[in-house]
Amino acid sequence: MTTHDWTLETQLVHNAFKTDRSTGAVSVPIQHASTFHQSSFDDFGQYDYSRSGTPTRQALEDTIAALEGGTRGLAFASGMAAISTAFLLLSKGDHVLVTRDVYGGTFRMITQVLSRFGIEHTFVDMTNLNEVKQGIQSNTKVIYMETPSNPTLGITDIEGVVQIAKEHDCLTFLDNTFLTPALQRPLDLGVDVVLHSATKFLSGHSDVLSGLAVVKDEKLGDELYSLQNSFGAVLGVQDCWLVLRGLKTLQVRLEKASQTALELASFLKEHPAVKKVYYPGLNDHPGADIQRKQASGAGAVLSFELENQAAVKELVDGVTLPVFAVSLGAVESILSYPAKMSHAAMPKEEREKRGITDGLLRLSVGVENGEDLKRDFKQALDQLKPALVNQS
């Protein structure tokens, strides 16, 4: 049987780089070399300079390509490096259509950087396919999706957007950071470029900064590789190894965290101090049916809204287990405040249009015991002053 005959959870451990061919080592070797000797003037090897490629980076790139069902993977120094390099496929005068509630770093890249180079943009609610259709312009070249979106967990109908894109000869990019190929495989649904902040669930231990891109079309892969090599924001070999190590436990981490996320979302929904919960695993989430159709789970990230910033401050000071920090997707639960963290680059009026209020918190659930997390949040919520609890 070939590697592709196994389920993804088995492929995470038993892939093409299960053992080193020259030594039998069961861990991918870390090749700390900036340059590579060529055996003769007329016989150059596969590798020449480490910006262009290394055996360790190749192992990660080939592994993520296989997991996503693509033909080529590319590893970058961060998630934003991967996204920025993908946007280099655009030229002056092109237009990109972007999901409205997008990660703050992507928002900044589009509004403050791409616009300086004559690349136009429009933000639309991609949970509404009619808005997507209406947002298409004659110069639209890329439709950029996040699903679930960050931080309000909006769900986009991937196949619906892909169909619109094909009708207008557009490429589709999708940030798959929240779900990973363990729960969602966008290339199988027709997406052209899948992007990841591998800093998050793929590596899973808050100890590496990394980005990945995967494509199915070989010509597009060649174009992206040329941009990767030219732009130069590549991933170092030590970090490649850390991501490869993290991938081995992706399935078990994500399964555990997703189950706890559902339990916490259900608990938070019933607590009187919580105004609203955003989690696509809840049956009353507006995108729940689409999520079940295109993904095998709802993931381990949820958001919830309290009365105001004062309530947020009290809760953050009151919980014990989650770390209060930027980022997500780690073994430890991470509580974040989008208004001052992931979406700090977004003006307040733009945030509020997207439902990112001063009372919104995002929780990336870790692998702790679910009952312990529930008890921790309960005691913190129960201690909120009456004036900070929604009275409606």
Predicted regions and their residues:
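Conserved PLP-enzyme active-site core in the AAT-like
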Residues: 2, 18, 74-273, 278, ...
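N-terminal "arm"/small-domain region of PLP-dependent enzymes with the aminotransferase-like
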Residues: 2-54, 60-63
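Conserved N-terminal alpha-helix of the aminotransferase class I/II PLP-enzyme fold
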Residues: 35-84, 89, 105-112
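PLP-dependent enzyme catalytic core of the Aspartate aminotransferase-like
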Residues: 120, 138, 253, 310, ...
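A common structural junction motif
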Residues: 231-232, 319-329, 380-389
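Short, well-ordered beta-strand elements within core beta-sheets of diverse protein domains
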Residues: 243-252, 299-307, 362-366
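Conserved small-domain helix->loop->beta segment predominantly found in fold-type I
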Residues: 262-320, 324-326, 346-352, 392
